[in-house]
Swiss-Prot record:
Domain of life (superkingdom): Bacteria
Species annotation: Listeria monocytogenes serotype 4a (strain HCC23)
Oligomeric form and interacting partners: Homodimer.
Gene name tied to this protein: hisC
One Pfam family linked to the record: Aminotran_1_2
Name of the protein this chain belongs to: Histidinol-phosphate aminotransferase
Pathway as given in its UniProt record: Amino-acid biosynthesis; L-histidine biosynthesis; L-histidine from 5-phospho-alpha-D-ribose 1-diphosphate: step 7/9
E.C. number: 2.6.1.9
Lineage: Bacteria, Bacillati, Bacillota, Bacilli, Bacillales
Matches recorded under SUPFAM superfamilies: PLP-dependent transferases (SSF53383)
Modification N6-(pyridoxal phosphate)lysine occurs at: K222
Named cofactor requirement(s): pyridoxal 5'-phosphate
Keywords tagged on the record: Amino-acid biosynthesis, Aminotransferase, Histidine biosynthesis, Pyridoxal phosphate, Transferase
An individual GO BP term: L-histidine biosynthetic process
């Protein structure tokens, strides 16, 4: 086969082991998955009720425009419906963005470490990837990113809060950054974890009307608890949305996914409860980290913590796994002596912390 040259050296995504597989291997009767930043509280009771009572005509294609969901989300954020695009998770939106803006003559700027799919999709398109190391505290080096932009740059990625460090860039700094980015360079502000930030930042969706080169990406996979439904969306100027729709598959979000997302966004009381529970979980880890001088906890603003114990990441990962907790080894994330742990329920956090204390 005459494969694209840009695929040379790239590897496919390797999912972690299934919980059942890990239990069988280690002889465990229970395992808790804290590796994929899923919502430990599940999803809204309204979503659960819809799931229990919904019947979907599986032989009928879904609404390719996601009309009902589009109206609800537009009303929620006070946007025009044409300022939205819906995709099969933010993963698909990242793919569409790289497809319309990157090729072998272009480059893209991002932090490192950050969400790996920016880099992967850029390389698939054959583009040059310019990675700017995070600052010592895990924050984006925004000045360094600005300096990396040239005439061939078409996309700049800002993951906020950043995955895997959890650092959050406040709105004033985002605006100052946007003021300096050339108007023909798209800034992707990936806010997959924005609903977890405490206290919540002021509404800023209106920025797309000031900065015509901005797209804000969000998802129903995290705090809304719909990871398997695969519904993400982008907020941007209509001209950007029009270009993305050219390459968007016509029926890319499912009927049930659209319906579940509508119920999910309506239940903001559940979202507030999730945000409070998550903030309390972060405090548990902060209290733990303060007791041990060798422990470094990166600023946590998502639903996970990146914690450096000064111990080889694989050792930490295997130790927690053998004790019934699947986490994410920092070795694959650019942090060789750290692990990323999803914030769980209070008792789950306490159990993991107790195990880490024993390891230290």
């Amino acid at each position: 086969m005459k494969w694209k040259k840009s695929l040379t050296g790239l590897s496919s995504y390797k999912p972690g082991k299934r919980e059942e597989e890990v239990m069988a291997e280690l002889g465990l009767t229970k395992i808790t998955k804290l590796s994929s930043n899923e919502n430990p509280l599940g999803t809204s009771p309204k979503v659960a009720a819809l799931q229990a009572n919904s019947s979907v005509e599986t032989e009928i294609y879904p609404d390719g425009w996601a009309s009902s969901l589009r109206t609800v989300v537009a009303d929620f954020y006070q946007l025009d419906e044409e300022e939205l695009i819906f995709t099969a998770g933010v993963d698909e939106l990242i793919e569409l963005l790289t497809r319309v803006l990157l090729d072998t003559t272009k480059n893209t700027v991002m932090a490192t470490p950050t969400f790996v799919q920016y880099r992967q999709n850029a390389l698939i398109e054959g583009a040059e990837v310019r990675e700017i190391p995070l600052l010592v505290d895990g924050a984006h080096d925004l000045d360094g990113m600005l300096n990396a932009i040239d005439d061939n740059t078409t996309i700049v990625w800002v993951c906020n809060p950043n995955n895997p460090t959890g650092n959050y860039i406040d709105l004033a700094d985002i605006q100052a950054f946007l003021d300096k980015v050339p108007s023909d360079v798209l800034v992707v502000l990936d806010e997959a974890y924005i609903e977890y930030v405490t206290p919540q930042p002021e509404k800023h969706e209106h920025l797309i009307r000031t900065y015509k080169n901005l797209i804000i990406t969000r998802t129903f996979s995290k705090i809304y608890g719909l990871a398997s439904a695969r519904v993400g969306y982008g907020i941007a100027d209509k001209a950007i949305i029009e270009q993305l729709n050219i390459v968007r598959p016509p029926f890319n979000t499912t009927s049930i996914g659209q319906k579940l997302a509508i119920e999910a966004i309506k239940d903001q009381a559940f979202i507030e409860a999730c945000r409070t529970s998550n903030a309390n979980g972060i405090k548990q880890y902060e209290t733990f980290a303060k007791r041990f001088e060798q422990v470094k906890l990166y600023p946590a603003n998502g639903n996970f913590v990146l914690i450096d114990l000064g111990i080889e990441a694989g050792t930490i990962f295997s130790y927690l796994e053998k004790n019934g907790y699947i986490t994410r080894s920092g070795a694959a994330l650019g942090f060789p002596t750290a692990v990323r742990i999803t914030i769980g329920k209070e008792e789950e956090n306490s159990a993991v912390i107790a195990l880490l204390e024993k390891l230290l």
